[in-house]
């Protein structure tokens, strides 16, 4: 499977050292199988006057069974709870790989309203169920990263 990472620089050797904490699926290296999603991720760097660079990887899916994986097929109560724990620094899970929806602008607004206590969980789930998830994959361990092989990059 081909996966993409959007940044301001080429990342030939992904690592966990440079990852941020308190994001959707916790500390890790984020990729997507959707080229258009990687282009969107580059947008924030381009708006700051930096280059947008998409790095491309081959992911060895045949070995995914070796990883402890959490998959969210939709925006759900479980997804929302997991995002809340990760973004608030309370995630204590040991997943190698987490797969699920991206909190895009509309989804992010709903999540923020919930985090801020302005809507309850039921209302947040009701709003999210109509959204089609964009897919992100978070490689959270070195074991998971070992299945990701750099193939090249392109400047936008």
Predicted feature descriptions by range:
Residues 20-44:
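Extended catalytic/binding region for NAD+/ADP-ribose chemistry, centered on the ART fold
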């Amino acid at each position: 499977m081909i996966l993409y990472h959007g940044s301001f620089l080429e990342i030939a050797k992904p690592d966990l050292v440079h990852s941020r904490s308190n994001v959707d699926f916790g500390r890790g290296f984020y990729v997507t199988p959707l080229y258009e999603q990687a282009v969107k991720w580059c947008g924030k760097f381009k708006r700051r006057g930096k280059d947008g660079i998409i790095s491309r990887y081959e992911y060895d899916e045949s070995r995914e069974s070796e990883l402890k994986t959490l998959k969210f097929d939709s925006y759900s109560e479980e997804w929302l709870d997991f995002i809340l724990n990760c973004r608030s620094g309370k995630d204590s899970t040991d997943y190698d790989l987490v797969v699920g929806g991206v909190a895009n602008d509309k989804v992010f607004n709903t999540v923020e309203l919930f985090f801020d206590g302005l809507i309850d969980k039921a209302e947040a789930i009701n709003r999210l169920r109509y959204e089609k998830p964009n897919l992100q994959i978070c490689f959270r361990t070195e074991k998971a990263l070992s299945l990701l092989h750099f193939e090249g990059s392109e400047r936008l």
